[in-house]
């Protein structure tokens, strides 16, 4: 134990050194080690949200998780099953009992991210050291390998934007170490534990690591080391059994992570992918690019064929060379991303291979002849300096390249053993310094670029662009003036996780995974248009009054320049550039109704809104909706400008100012309705690009067809009203071809909403409890109690203490049947099969212990 602590102390020191530039920039310039996009928009808000819920004992369900939902399952891609984060939360809770910590403050979580990165890097170096020491039998070289891998540019890139990505720097070396230990010592315990932890930690990277582990096992079984003691066939069987046991051990967490993926709605990637990528500054992995930089020594080590006689040197030389070639094949990016859109997230494997290869080169290079060393070194340096000349880019670490090379050469030239040993240590230190300089330059050029410095700093996070004192004060004012079950429609610019870090019940969420019920509701049932198309977000209600009232939105806050205000919101407060509007036709979040409509009878979004206002919508139950709104498209005049029809529903825009399709509405129609819903199918043609659909003063920015983040939903609904001339103007830009199919134009006079508002019972409401809600019912008839929170399988309902049936209504909401005298509804949530998975995991853990004991006893008998 003492030895472990010593090494952890060494690696903690090295980690501080590796983070020294980051710490300096934070203290001196206030620059954060958290990215300006996903970092402060996703990672920090999600961590704050999880801490807020867990610290009060709410583990699974919350109504303020966007529109509400199972945050434990849906955030398993991020942090809800992340072992390091769970330990981090427990430590913070413990510290809060001793000292005052402002966990509501953003800066605390920004600093926490840096502290955790330092600790994580220390653990990662220790795990890499264990593997390196096992295969090299050299402590000094193993420390160098660990530093080269963990303190490489990719670790910083992962950590600054997606901190859970860099967990692989711990798990991959530990996995490979457990495999080697199994093959050479027949000890399966660590392998089973490692598989268990990997599966628990993150289901997405469990897939990566399973591919890596399976590939490594196959390689090591095919190409055996002289110290391997398990026969090939037996090794395959025992590894398979161990992996299954590890999976079983993890099911109490892993199962729910997989459920989040299966419940997600994501369009299959259908874009074109090149067979190969060309070599340029972005793909040259030996020079300063945005993703990964391998030291020039990697090239030199690959060229030293004589050293291939050593088993692990040969293994990692082949792996390094193979993965260098594969880095130019986009299909590999798709393979590691589950055969979806290509994502460059697997390059940590290449970084690891390179680090191990350089370490082994350092161990064996003294057996080279001077000529071999010089030839391989000169070729490596030519590649590096040729890159600098080609890209017209000088980076500071180039100065160290010839110095490192010269030290290595001196070791070969000098005959005195004492000098050679001392120079060998200096050579190792010089490689560490080179790696450090490469990483610092990478951080400066590829992470701390202009946008990062401007948007990821201590000033920005307290400004009006992210979270100012005035914003938080106004949010508190709205919070104190509404009921607990009412919502606030507000977000800072494009910060869709504003509700998470300003602590209110909002309407928006930015996450990679959503339960499909919510997206089905947004995309299909009501066709709520997102101003900025993205598969990873939902936001607001596109100014649609009916939906605002259905979700009990009490207040909306807008900046001076923002518009798209719902029809019956009135201004109640102005402060600086902000205005607060109150919903004058709000509805309670809970209602009891006898009216049930069959979803199959509803054909348009406006009819679905009216059905929800009058009653509830169910699948395969209820009566037909008898009051459909008429399509007004046949009653409008249409004109075009800068746009030419080139086929059925195909148009071409030219002129550089956008093409317009103008719909003129007769006065009698304009006088009859307050708002209009325009439904159209719109898709970009050639040339493919991002494009904008502007409906009068509202701009909808949509993604190019090949975009990874495109929703794949081409039929859009725009709430609008005519200008002073009675026109609804559709403007398409930029120039090029579009597919446009105008499908519906419906008018809305809000008579249905007004009637629902007048008849509403505002004495009925809910308040949040741990993992659920409690509804207090006032006077009502028997019927269905509809509650505007997302339904999830795993909910249990109790009416006045007695179990009751619970089901989905309104495409995503929750309902419970109640009798006339019912007073209270309690809804509790636990992820489906929670107890079952815990039981299976416990049984699997017992079997794992028995399996390891049997294997160990057989091994002892073999020794006798």
Kindly give the residue locations of the regions a language model identified.
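A cross-kingdom signal targeting lumenal/periplasmic-facing segments of multi-pass membrane
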Residues: 84, 126, 502-610, 614-635, ...
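Periplasmic/ER-lumenal interhelical loops and adjacent helix-loop junctions
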Residues: 41, 45-50, 83, 89, ...
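Extracytoplasmic/lumenal acceptor-recognition loop(s) of multi-pass membrane glycoenzymes
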Residues: 74-79, 434-458, 479-547, 587, ...
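Contiguous transmembrane helix-bundle modules in multi-pass membrane proteins
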Residues: 205, 318-324, 337-463, 822-823, ...
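Active-site-proximal, structured, solvent-exposed surfaces of multi-pass membrane proteins
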Residues: 47, 634-864
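Membrane-embedded helix bundles of polyisoprenyl
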Residues: 116-134, 140-183, 187-224, 235-258, ...
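Membrane-interface coil-to-helix junctions
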Residues: 15-124, 150-159, 163-169, 263-266, ...
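Start-transfer (signal-anchor) and selected internal transmembrane alpha helices
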Residues: 1-26, 427-428, 846-864
